[in-house]
């Protein structure tokens, strides 16, 4: 991981986040209001509080990162938001609606999407077919890939997703033959199906080569301006290049929240990240 001080020159050349037109959904205009709100969210496993009284707010259209070293509680927080492991205390609101008790598939239906560190792709199918399954799953009211059919995979929505995921040149390649970074791009493309309101990315940079990381940054920065996302990451370099608000977690709690420049120059954040470098 690049050192914090080495990021200044890269950030100086950074273009505005989320300036691309959407081409998906009813409007590409920036929305106002609150997209995601966590109030006092806690997730305990017995006596252990993996996430302890976390509060944060993501506005509509905002690109947000939750950072932390291994064991900070990032993935547990991710699972609390998705509904896979609901919080044991606190509330979660999604565009003003309390979703704390909703199961994962209902959160997806309301426009919350997610990608995971572990791949959920159909390796025997092509890139185009995987994207088509995502489109059909959302259009059917459920993100149920196994119930969708892979025929007629040249739909307009699928072509649009191929372009957005920057995968048009390998549309008919089987997933099993893709490089790791290309699979990550495909996962992001599938998460874009159905014009989501907010996407959660769980450490998308993990295991990527330098070239793949650059492609990931370009893809994240090309997402529509009206679309919110939350990037769960341990990689400070990646996160600071693509977001406009950051929360840093440490030992399950919020350590700092601020702009990328504020986080980049925070002494405590520097101590944690410089101390955790391999």
Enumerate the predicted regions with their spans.
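Glycine-rich phosphate-binding loops of nucleotide-dependent enzymes
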Residues: 2-278
């Amino acid at each position: 991981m690049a050192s914090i001080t080495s990021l200044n020159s890269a950030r100086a050349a950074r273009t505005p986040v989320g300036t691309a037109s959407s081409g998906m959904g009813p409007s590409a205009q920036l929305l106002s209001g609150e997209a995601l709100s966590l109030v006092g969210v806690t997730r305990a496993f017995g006596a252990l509080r993996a996430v302890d009284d976390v509060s944060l707010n993501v506005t509509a259209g905002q690109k947000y990162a939750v950072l932390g070293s291994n064991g900070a509680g990032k993935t547990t927080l991710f699972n609390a938001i998705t509904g896979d492991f609901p919080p044991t205390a606190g509330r979660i609101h999604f565009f003003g609606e309390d979703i704390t008790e909703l199961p994962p598939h209902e959160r997806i239906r309301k426009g919350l999407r997610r990608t995971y560190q572990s791949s959920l792709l159909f390796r025997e199918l092509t890139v185009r077919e995987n994207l088509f399954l995502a489109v059909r799953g959302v259009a059917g009211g459920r993100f149920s890939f196994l119930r969708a059919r892979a025929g007629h995979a040249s739909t307009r929505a699928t072509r649009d997703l191929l372009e957005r995921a920057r995968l048009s040149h390998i549309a008919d390649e089987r997933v099993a033959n893709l490089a790791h970074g290309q699979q990550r791009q495909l996962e992001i493309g599938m998460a874009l199906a159905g014009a989501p309101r907010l996407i959660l990315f769980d450490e998308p940079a993990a295991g990527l080569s330098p070239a793949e990381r650059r492609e990931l940054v370009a893809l994240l920065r090309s997402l529509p301006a009206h679309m919110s996302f939350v990037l769960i990451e341990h990689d400070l370099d990646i996160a600071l290049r693509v977001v406009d608000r950051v929360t840093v977690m440490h030992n399950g709690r919020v350590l700092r929240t601020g702009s990328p420049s504020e986080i980049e120059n925070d002494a405590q954040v520097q101590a944690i990240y410089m101390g955790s470098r391999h």
